[in-house]
Amino acid sequence: MPIITDVYAREVLDSRGNPTVEVEVLTESGAFGRALVPSGASTGEHEAVELRDGDKSRYLGKGVTKAVDNVNEIIAPELIEGEFSVLEQVSIDKMMIQLDGTENKGKLGANAILGVSIAVARAAADLLGQPLYKYLGGFNGKQLPVPMMNIVNGGSHSDAPIAFQEFMVLPVGAESFKESLRWGAEIFHNLKSILKNRGLETAVGDEGGFAPKFEGTEDAVETILEAIKAVGLEPGKDVFLGFDCASSEFFEDGVYNYAKFEGENGAKRSAEEQVDYLEELVNKYPIITIEDGMDENDWDGWKVLTDRIGDKVQLVGDDLFVTNTVKLSEGIEKGIGNSILIKVNQIGTLTETFDAIEMAQKAGYTAVVSHRSGETEDTTISDIAVATNAGQIKTGSLSRTDRIAKYNQLLRIEDELYETGKFDGLKSFYNLSK
Protein backbone atom coordinates (compact mmCIF):
# COMPACT_ATOMS: atom_id res chain seq x y z
CA MET A 1 0.00 0.00 0.00
CA PRO A 2 1.23 3.52 -0.81
CA ILE A 3 0.13 5.18 2.45
CA ILE A 4 2.96 6.94 4.31
CA THR A 5 3.56 5.45 7.75
CA ASP A 6 6.84 7.07 8.76
CA VAL A 7 8.83 10.20 7.94
CA TYR A 8 12.15 10.85 9.63
CA ALA A 9 14.76 13.57 9.15
CA ARG A 10 18.30 13.77 10.49
CA GLU A 11 21.24 16.15 10.32
CA VAL A 12 24.07 14.83 8.11
CA LEU A 13 27.06 16.45 6.37
CA ASP A 14 27.50 17.70 2.82
CA SER A 15 30.64 17.73 0.65
CA ARG A 16 32.00 20.81 2.42
CA GLY A 17 31.58 19.32 5.88
CA ASN A 18 28.57 21.52 6.60
CA PRO A 19 25.31 20.14 8.01
CA THR A 20 22.43 19.39 5.69
CA VAL A 21 19.09 17.60 5.90
CA GLU A 22 18.44 13.95 5.10
CA VAL A 23 14.86 12.66 5.00
CA GLU A 24 13.51 9.11 4.90
CA VAL A 25 9.95 8.14 3.96
CA LEU A 26 8.40 4.71 4.54
CA THR A 27 5.06 3.32 3.38
CA GLU A 28 2.93 0.61 4.96
CA SER A 29 3.99 -1.80 2.21
CA GLY A 30 7.66 -1.23 3.01
CA ALA A 31 8.46 1.05 0.07
CA PHE A 32 11.28 3.38 1.06
CA GLY A 33 12.75 6.66 -0.13
CA ARG A 34 15.73 8.67 1.09
CA ALA A 35 16.85 12.15 0.02
CA LEU A 36 19.75 14.43 0.90
CA VAL A 37 19.50 18.17 0.32
CA PRO A 38 22.30 20.21 -1.34
CA SER A 39 23.48 23.71 -0.43
CA GLY A 40 24.90 26.63 -2.41
CA ALA A 41 27.84 28.99 -1.77
CA SER A 42 26.85 31.80 -4.14
CA THR A 43 23.11 32.16 -3.67
CA GLY A 44 20.60 34.40 -5.39
CA GLU A 45 18.83 36.82 -3.06
CA HIS A 46 15.45 35.57 -4.31
CA GLU A 47 16.08 31.88 -3.55
CA ALA A 48 13.88 29.92 -1.18
CA VAL A 49 15.22 30.02 2.37
CA GLU A 50 17.72 27.44 3.53
CA LEU A 51 16.96 27.28 7.25
CA ARG A 52 20.05 27.31 9.46
CA ASP A 53 20.18 27.30 13.27
CA GLY A 54 22.48 30.27 13.76
CA ASP A 55 23.84 28.73 16.96
CA LYS A 56 27.56 29.55 16.83
CA SER A 57 28.32 26.83 19.38
CA ARG A 58 27.37 24.14 16.82
CA TYR A 59 28.91 23.88 13.35
CA LEU A 60 29.73 27.62 13.43
CA GLY A 61 26.05 28.44 13.29
CA LYS A 62 25.35 26.28 10.24
CA GLY A 63 23.44 23.49 11.98
CA VAL A 64 20.08 22.43 10.54
CA THR A 65 18.34 21.01 13.61
CA LYS A 66 15.51 23.53 13.19
CA ALA A 67 14.82 22.23 9.68
CA VAL A 68 15.11 18.64 10.91
CA ASP A 69 12.66 19.34 13.73
CA ASN A 70 10.26 20.96 11.28
CA VAL A 71 10.18 17.71 9.31
CA ASN A 72 9.85 15.43 12.33
CA GLU A 73 7.44 17.54 14.38
CA ILE A 74 5.36 19.45 11.81
CA ILE A 75 5.47 17.90 8.33
CA ALA A 76 5.61 14.22 9.36
CA PRO A 77 2.42 14.33 11.50
CA GLU A 78 0.54 16.02 8.65
CA LEU A 79 1.58 13.32 6.20
CA ILE A 80 0.94 10.39 8.53
CA GLU A 81 -2.29 11.58 10.13
CA GLY A 82 -3.56 12.76 6.74
CA GLU A 83 -2.90 9.27 5.34
CA PHE A 84 -1.14 10.67 2.31
CA SER A 85 -0.03 8.31 -0.43
CA VAL A 86 3.49 8.61 -1.85
CA LEU A 87 1.81 8.69 -5.26
CA GLU A 88 0.26 12.07 -4.41
CA GLN A 89 3.38 14.11 -5.18
CA VAL A 90 1.63 17.31 -6.23
CA SER A 91 -0.80 17.22 -3.30
CA ILE A 92 2.00 16.62 -0.81
CA ASP A 93 4.13 19.43 -2.22
CA LYS A 94 1.13 21.77 -2.19
CA MET A 95 0.32 20.80 1.40
CA MET A 96 3.86 21.61 2.55
CA ILE A 97 3.83 24.96 0.75
CA GLN A 98 0.56 25.85 2.48
CA LEU A 99 1.83 24.55 5.81
CA ASP A 100 4.80 26.88 5.50
CA GLY A 101 2.66 29.81 4.45
CA THR A 102 5.46 32.11 3.27
CA GLU A 103 6.54 33.09 -0.24
CA ASN A 104 10.12 31.92 0.31
CA LYS A 105 9.55 28.86 2.51
CA GLY A 106 11.16 30.77 5.36
CA LYS A 107 9.06 29.21 8.12
CA LEU A 108 9.75 25.50 7.64
CA GLY A 109 12.81 25.92 5.41
CA ALA A 110 13.22 24.89 1.78
CA ASN A 111 15.80 22.36 2.97
CA ALA A 112 13.14 20.66 5.12
CA ILE A 113 10.43 20.74 2.46
CA LEU A 114 12.67 19.60 -0.40
CA GLY A 115 14.02 16.66 1.58
CA VAL A 116 10.48 15.38 2.07
CA SER A 117 9.47 16.11 -1.53
CA ILE A 118 12.31 14.07 -3.03
CA ALA A 119 12.07 11.26 -0.46
CA VAL A 120 8.36 10.88 -1.28
CA ALA A 121 9.16 10.56 -4.99
CA ARG A 122 11.85 7.99 -4.30
CA ALA A 123 9.47 5.97 -2.13
CA ALA A 124 6.87 6.09 -4.91
CA ALA A 125 9.40 4.83 -7.45
CA ASP A 126 10.38 2.05 -5.04
CA LEU A 127 6.71 1.17 -4.54
CA LEU A 128 6.21 0.79 -8.28
CA GLY A 129 9.51 -0.98 -8.83
CA GLN A 130 10.71 1.70 -11.23
CA PRO A 131 13.89 3.73 -11.56
CA LEU A 132 13.33 7.31 -10.38
CA TYR A 133 13.75 8.82 -13.85
CA LYS A 134 11.07 6.52 -15.24
CA TYR A 135 8.66 7.28 -12.42
CA LEU A 136 9.16 11.03 -12.86
CA GLY A 137 9.24 11.10 -16.66
CA GLY A 138 7.19 8.13 -17.79
CA PHE A 139 8.03 6.39 -21.05
CA ASN A 140 9.13 9.66 -22.66
CA GLY A 141 12.11 10.35 -20.38
CA LYS A 142 14.97 9.16 -22.58
CA GLN A 143 17.39 11.97 -23.41
CA LEU A 144 20.85 11.78 -21.86
CA PRO A 145 22.16 15.26 -21.07
CA VAL A 146 25.27 17.00 -22.36
CA PRO A 147 27.52 17.39 -19.29
CA MET A 148 28.72 20.91 -18.49
CA MET A 149 31.98 20.04 -16.74
CA ASN A 150 33.42 22.66 -14.45
CA ILE A 151 37.14 21.95 -14.67
CA VAL A 152 38.46 25.32 -13.48
CA ASN A 153 36.99 27.04 -10.43
CA GLY A 154 37.26 30.73 -9.65
CA GLY A 155 35.24 33.33 -7.78
CA SER A 156 33.53 32.18 -4.58
CA HIS A 157 34.33 28.53 -5.32
CA SER A 158 38.10 28.82 -4.93
CA ASP A 159 41.00 31.00 -3.90
CA ALA A 160 42.10 31.52 -7.52
CA PRO A 161 42.42 35.22 -8.50
CA ILE A 162 39.71 35.02 -11.18
CA ALA A 163 36.29 36.67 -10.95
CA PHE A 164 34.38 34.14 -13.06
CA GLN A 165 33.22 31.28 -10.88
CA GLU A 166 33.33 28.40 -13.35
CA PHE A 167 35.07 27.49 -16.60
CA MET A 168 33.36 24.53 -18.21
CA VAL A 169 33.89 22.14 -21.12
CA LEU A 170 30.91 20.73 -23.02
CA PRO A 171 31.69 17.62 -25.16
CA VAL A 172 28.82 18.16 -27.61
CA GLY A 173 30.45 16.22 -30.45
CA ALA A 174 30.36 12.88 -28.65
CA GLU A 175 28.15 10.05 -29.89
CA SER A 176 26.89 9.11 -26.43
CA PHE A 177 26.89 10.27 -22.84
CA LYS A 178 29.47 7.59 -22.10
CA GLU A 179 31.81 9.01 -24.72
CA SER A 180 31.22 12.60 -23.59
CA LEU A 181 32.19 11.61 -20.06
CA ARG A 182 35.38 9.96 -21.31
CA TRP A 183 36.30 13.05 -23.29
CA GLY A 184 35.74 15.21 -20.24
CA ALA A 185 37.85 12.97 -18.04
CA GLU A 186 40.70 12.94 -20.56
CA ILE A 187 40.60 16.75 -20.83
CA PHE A 188 40.62 17.00 -17.04
CA HIS A 189 43.68 14.77 -16.67
CA ASN A 190 45.54 16.51 -19.49
CA LEU A 191 44.77 19.85 -17.87
CA LYS A 192 46.26 18.57 -14.63
CA SER A 193 49.48 17.62 -16.41
CA ILE A 194 49.67 21.02 -18.11
CA LEU A 195 49.20 22.81 -14.80
CA LYS A 196 51.89 20.67 -13.15
CA ASN A 197 54.33 21.43 -15.96
CA ARG A 198 53.68 25.14 -15.47
CA GLY A 199 54.32 24.83 -11.75
CA LEU A 200 50.71 25.68 -10.92
CA GLU A 201 48.56 24.19 -8.15
CA THR A 202 46.45 21.16 -8.92
CA ALA A 203 44.33 21.26 -5.78
CA VAL A 204 40.62 21.27 -6.55
CA GLY A 205 37.81 23.59 -5.48
CA ASP A 206 34.32 22.89 -4.12
CA GLU A 207 33.08 21.38 -7.37
CA GLY A 208 36.16 19.35 -8.23
CA GLY A 209 37.75 21.76 -10.70
CA PHE A 210 41.28 23.07 -10.46
CA ALA A 211 41.87 26.44 -8.83
CA PRO A 212 45.37 27.52 -9.93
CA LYS A 213 46.67 31.07 -9.86
CA PHE A 214 46.16 31.88 -13.52
CA GLU A 215 47.19 35.30 -14.75
CA GLY A 216 43.58 36.02 -15.66
CA THR A 217 40.47 34.83 -17.45
CA GLU A 218 42.08 34.46 -20.86
CA ASP A 219 45.01 32.53 -19.41
CA ALA A 220 42.50 30.05 -17.96
CA VAL A 221 40.68 29.76 -21.28
CA GLU A 222 43.85 29.29 -23.33
CA THR A 223 45.06 26.59 -20.95
CA ILE A 224 41.77 24.70 -21.19
CA LEU A 225 41.92 24.90 -24.99
CA GLU A 226 45.42 23.44 -24.84
CA ALA A 227 44.10 20.51 -22.77
CA ILE A 228 41.28 19.89 -25.25
CA LYS A 229 43.72 19.79 -28.17
CA ALA A 230 46.05 17.49 -26.22
CA VAL A 231 43.26 14.88 -26.23
CA GLY A 232 43.02 15.15 -30.01
CA LEU A 233 39.68 16.98 -29.92
CA GLU A 234 38.77 20.14 -31.79
CA PRO A 235 37.53 23.17 -29.82
CA GLY A 236 34.41 24.62 -31.41
CA LYS A 237 33.46 21.30 -32.99
CA ASP A 238 33.94 18.42 -30.57
CA VAL A 239 34.07 20.49 -27.40
CA PHE A 240 32.76 23.96 -26.57
CA LEU A 241 33.47 26.18 -23.58
CA GLY A 242 31.12 27.66 -21.01
CA PHE A 243 31.35 30.23 -18.20
CA ASP A 244 29.45 30.78 -15.01
CA CYS A 245 30.33 34.41 -14.40
CA ALA A 246 28.30 34.58 -11.15
CA SER A 247 28.30 38.32 -11.77
CA SER A 248 26.16 39.09 -8.74
CA GLU A 249 29.16 38.11 -6.62
CA PHE A 250 31.21 41.07 -7.88
CA PHE A 251 28.51 43.60 -8.83
CA GLU A 252 28.83 46.54 -6.46
CA ASP A 253 27.13 49.94 -6.65
CA GLY A 254 26.24 49.55 -10.31
CA VAL A 255 29.73 48.42 -11.30
CA TYR A 256 31.10 44.98 -12.20
CA ASN A 257 34.11 45.08 -9.90
CA TYR A 258 36.53 42.35 -10.98
CA ALA A 259 39.03 43.65 -8.43
CA LYS A 260 37.02 41.89 -5.70
CA PHE A 261 38.54 38.59 -6.84
CA GLU A 262 41.39 39.67 -9.10
CA GLY A 263 42.97 42.36 -6.95
CA GLU A 264 44.80 45.23 -8.58
CA ASN A 265 44.63 43.49 -11.96
CA GLY A 266 40.83 43.45 -11.87
CA ALA A 267 38.92 45.90 -14.04
CA LYS A 268 35.83 47.86 -13.06
CA ARG A 269 33.20 47.71 -15.78
CA SER A 270 29.86 49.40 -16.32
CA ALA A 271 26.93 47.27 -17.52
CA GLU A 272 27.62 48.29 -21.12
CA GLU A 273 31.30 47.48 -20.72
CA GLN A 274 30.42 44.11 -19.18
CA VAL A 275 28.32 43.26 -22.24
CA ASP A 276 31.14 44.41 -24.53
CA TYR A 277 33.64 42.25 -22.63
CA LEU A 278 31.48 39.12 -22.82
CA GLU A 279 30.83 39.70 -26.52
CA GLU A 280 34.57 40.09 -27.06
CA LEU A 281 35.23 36.73 -25.37
CA VAL A 282 32.47 35.04 -27.40
CA ASN A 283 33.92 36.35 -30.65
CA LYS A 284 37.41 35.20 -29.70
CA TYR A 285 36.76 31.75 -28.20
CA PRO A 286 34.41 28.77 -28.88
CA ILE A 287 31.98 29.67 -26.09
CA ILE A 288 28.48 28.18 -26.26
CA THR A 289 27.02 29.03 -22.85
CA ILE A 290 27.32 31.87 -20.33
CA GLU A 291 25.57 31.73 -16.98
CA ASP A 292 24.74 34.84 -14.95
CA GLY A 293 26.72 37.14 -17.22
CA MET A 294 24.96 40.08 -15.60
CA ASP A 295 23.82 40.78 -12.03
CA GLU A 296 20.51 39.23 -10.97
CA ASN A 297 18.91 42.67 -10.58
CA ASP A 298 20.48 44.25 -13.67
CA TRP A 299 17.58 43.38 -15.97
CA ASP A 300 18.43 46.24 -18.33
CA GLY A 301 21.95 44.84 -18.68
CA TRP A 302 20.53 41.35 -19.24
CA LYS A 303 18.31 42.70 -22.02
CA VAL A 304 21.27 44.35 -23.77
CA LEU A 305 23.32 41.15 -23.44
CA THR A 306 20.47 39.01 -24.79
CA ASP A 307 19.86 41.31 -27.74
CA ARG A 308 23.57 41.42 -28.50
CA ILE A 309 24.59 37.73 -28.38
CA GLY A 310 21.49 35.73 -27.41
CA ASP A 311 21.13 34.23 -30.88
CA LYS A 312 24.53 32.54 -30.82
CA VAL A 313 25.24 31.86 -27.13
CA GLN A 314 23.13 30.19 -24.47
CA LEU A 315 22.49 32.80 -21.76
CA VAL A 316 21.54 30.98 -18.58
CA GLY A 317 19.72 32.65 -15.71
CA ASP A 318 20.62 31.19 -12.33
CA ASP A 319 20.50 33.96 -9.72
CA LEU A 320 18.30 35.77 -12.25
CA PHE A 321 15.48 33.20 -12.28
CA VAL A 322 16.20 31.04 -9.16
CA THR A 323 14.10 28.15 -10.56
CA ASN A 324 11.03 30.32 -9.97
CA THR A 325 8.17 30.37 -12.49
CA VAL A 326 7.19 33.95 -11.57
CA LYS A 327 10.71 35.21 -12.28
CA LEU A 328 11.02 33.04 -15.39
CA SER A 329 7.68 34.19 -16.77
CA GLU A 330 8.78 37.80 -16.43
CA GLY A 331 12.06 37.01 -18.16
CA ILE A 332 10.32 35.26 -21.05
CA GLU A 333 7.93 38.18 -21.47
CA LYS A 334 10.79 40.70 -21.57
CA GLY A 335 13.09 38.59 -23.74
CA ILE A 336 15.72 38.19 -21.03
CA GLY A 337 18.17 35.29 -21.43
CA ASN A 338 17.28 32.10 -23.29
CA SER A 339 17.87 29.42 -20.66
CA ILE A 340 17.22 28.70 -17.00
CA LEU A 341 19.42 26.88 -14.51
CA ILE A 342 17.39 24.39 -12.50
CA LYS A 343 18.39 23.92 -8.87
CA VAL A 344 15.87 21.98 -6.83
CA ASN A 345 16.77 23.68 -3.56
CA GLN A 346 16.29 27.16 -5.03
CA ILE A 347 12.54 26.57 -5.13
CA GLY A 348 12.09 23.71 -2.66
CA THR A 349 9.75 21.10 -4.18
CA LEU A 350 9.83 18.69 -7.11
CA THR A 351 6.47 19.96 -8.36
CA GLU A 352 7.70 23.55 -8.64
CA THR A 353 10.94 22.35 -10.21
CA PHE A 354 9.08 20.48 -12.94
CA ASP A 355 6.78 23.48 -13.47
CA ALA A 356 9.82 25.68 -14.13
CA ILE A 357 11.33 23.20 -16.59
CA GLU A 358 8.04 22.85 -18.45
CA MET A 359 7.56 26.63 -18.67
CA ALA A 360 11.07 27.09 -20.04
CA GLN A 361 10.78 24.38 -22.66
CA LYS A 362 7.39 25.62 -23.89
CA ALA A 363 8.90 29.10 -24.37
CA GLY A 364 11.87 27.77 -26.34
CA TYR A 365 14.25 28.27 -23.43
CA THR A 366 16.56 25.44 -22.45
CA ALA A 367 16.63 24.08 -18.90
CA VAL A 368 19.99 23.10 -17.41
CA VAL A 369 19.63 20.80 -14.41
CA SER A 370 22.26 21.68 -11.83
CA HIS A 371 23.99 20.61 -8.65
CA ARG A 372 25.08 23.00 -5.88
CA SER A 373 28.60 23.63 -4.61
CA GLY A 374 27.70 21.88 -1.36
CA GLU A 375 26.63 18.44 -2.57
CA THR A 376 26.01 14.92 -1.27
CA GLU A 377 25.95 11.40 -2.64
CA ASP A 378 22.30 11.93 -3.68
CA THR A 379 21.85 11.48 -7.46
CA THR A 380 18.31 12.80 -7.92
CA ILE A 381 19.34 15.52 -10.37
CA SER A 382 20.62 12.89 -12.81
CA ASP A 383 17.19 11.28 -12.88
CA ILE A 384 15.47 14.67 -13.21
CA ALA A 385 17.63 15.57 -16.21
CA VAL A 386 16.61 12.40 -18.06
CA ALA A 387 12.98 12.44 -16.89
CA THR A 388 12.43 15.94 -18.28
CA ASN A 389 14.60 15.54 -21.40
CA ALA A 390 16.45 18.63 -20.25
CA GLY A 391 19.39 17.87 -22.53
CA GLN A 392 22.00 19.46 -20.27
CA ILE A 393 23.33 18.82 -16.78
CA LYS A 394 25.80 20.80 -14.74
CA THR A 395 27.26 18.70 -11.96
CA GLY A 396 30.88 19.60 -11.52
CA SER A 397 34.25 18.32 -12.56
CA LEU A 398 35.75 14.87 -12.98
CA SER A 399 36.80 14.48 -9.36
CA ARG A 400 35.15 14.27 -5.92
CA THR A 401 32.68 11.47 -5.34
CA ASP A 402 29.83 13.92 -4.71
CA ARG A 403 30.16 14.98 -8.39
CA ILE A 404 31.10 11.62 -9.91
CA ALA A 405 28.05 9.98 -8.29
CA LYS A 406 25.79 11.95 -10.65
CA TYR A 407 27.81 10.99 -13.72
CA ASN A 408 27.85 7.33 -12.71
CA GLN A 409 24.08 7.39 -12.28
CA LEU A 410 23.73 8.74 -15.82
CA LEU A 411 25.94 5.92 -17.10
CA ARG A 412 23.58 3.44 -15.43
CA ILE A 413 20.54 5.15 -16.92
CA GLU A 414 22.11 5.15 -20.39
CA ASP A 415 22.71 1.40 -20.07
CA GLU A 416 19.13 0.82 -18.89
CA LEU A 417 17.64 2.82 -21.75
CA TYR A 418 19.91 1.07 -24.26
CA GLU A 419 18.61 1.72 -27.79
CA THR A 420 15.70 3.91 -26.67
CA GLY A 421 18.00 6.46 -25.07
CA LYS A 422 19.51 9.32 -27.05
CA PHE A 423 22.31 11.85 -26.72
CA ASP A 424 21.61 14.92 -28.84
CA GLY A 425 24.85 16.80 -28.35
CA LEU A 426 24.72 20.18 -30.08
CA LYS A 427 21.01 19.72 -30.88
CA SER A 428 20.33 20.13 -27.16
CA PHE A 429 21.00 23.84 -27.69
CA TYR A 430 17.75 24.38 -29.58
CA ASN A 431 17.63 27.96 -28.26
CA LEU A 432 20.48 29.02 -30.56
CA SER A 433 20.37 29.88 -34.25
CA LYS A 434 23.83 28.56 -35.07
Swiss-Prot record:
GO BP, sorted A to Z: glycolytic process
Pfam families cross-referenced by the UniProt entry: Enolase_C, Enolase_N
Q: Which reaction does it catalyse?
A: (2R)-2-phosphoglycerate = phosphoenolpyruvate + H2O
Which residues, if any, are the signal sequence?
Answer: none
Cofactor binding annotation: Binds a second Mg(2+) ion via substrate during catalysis.
Task: Provide the protein's localization.
Answer: Cytoplasm; Secreted; Cell surface
Provide the residue positions that the database annotates as binding (2R)-2-phosphoglycerate: Q165, K343, R372, S373, K394
Q: Which UniProt keywords apply?
A: Cytoplasm, Glycolysis, Lyase, Magnesium, Metal-binding, Secreted
Q: Which domain of life is it from?
A: Bacteria
EC number(s) reported in the record: 4.2.1.11
PANTHER family according to UniProt: ENOLASE
Q: Which family does it belong to?
A: Belongs to the enolase family.
Q: Specify the protein name.
A: Enolase
- UniProt source species: Staphylococcus saprophyticus subsp. saprophyticus (strain ATCC 15305 / DSM 20229 / NCIMB 8711 / NCTC 7292 / S-41)
Upper classification of the organism: Bacteria, Bacillati, Bacillota, Bacilli, Bacillales
Gene name, per UniProt, is: eno
